[in-house]
């Protein structure tokens, strides 16, 4: 964004927040317009070649996808890197306690703020991220100190949505795999690891 100048008679108030779903759609469209093949398939099995190499992904519709390099983007399940190639997971839970999140979007606010707010809660912290069509809310917490039900109730009370909307509980594996690259597979994102942002 523009760099604020010292002589502004006001404090600049802007920020950039991206709706992850819309960003994904934009990147898909941008890539397919440039020749990338995009297919919505669910991989159900992984075919190994040598011990540390992947030969193909087998999909539920019978499609077999061969490749030279595979990127494991299967989230916490880490289907290729951990489940198939046996990459070692190094947990950090002994020192980093937050292992759950409850998320609940709320209506777009007319009092737009340019920043994400991070607010302390009883067993963790919560965020409030203003987007153009909604506000993203979530509460990251430790399941050792609060139940999922109590965490949801605490978030609902904090954002004033006691009876509205459907909350989702996310379980997080905090830690990382020992090697991000194994054979011809690169683990990316949550397949490789996760550390809760404020910890």
Language-model regions, residue ranges each:
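FAD/FMN-dependent oxidoreductases across multiple families
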Residues: 132, 141-199
């Amino acid at each position: 964004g523009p760099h604020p100048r010292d002589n502004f008679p006001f404090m600049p108030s802007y920020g950039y927040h991206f709706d992850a779903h819309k960003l994904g759609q934009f990147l898909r469209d941008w890539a397919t317009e440039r020749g990338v093949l995009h297919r919505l398939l669910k991989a159900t099995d992984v075919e190994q070649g040598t011990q540390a190499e992947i030969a193909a992904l087998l999909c539920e519709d019978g499609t077999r996808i061969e490749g030279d390099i595979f990127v494991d983007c299967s989230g916490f399940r880490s289907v290729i890197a951990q489940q198939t190639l046996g990459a070692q997971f190094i947990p950090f839970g002994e020192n980093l306690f937050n292992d759950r999140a409850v998320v609940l979007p709320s209506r777009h606010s007319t009092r737009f703020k340019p920043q994400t707010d991070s607010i302390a809660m009883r067993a963790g912290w919560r965020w409030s991220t203003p987007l153009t069509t909604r506000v993203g809310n979530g509460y990251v917490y430790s399941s050792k100190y609060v139940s999922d039900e109590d965490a949801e109730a605490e978030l609902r009370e904090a954002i004033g949505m006691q009876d509205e909307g459907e909350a989702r509980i996310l379980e997080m594996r905090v830690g990382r795999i020992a090697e991000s690259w194994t054979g011809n597979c690169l683990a990316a994102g949550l397949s490789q690891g996760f550390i809760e942002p404020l910890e």
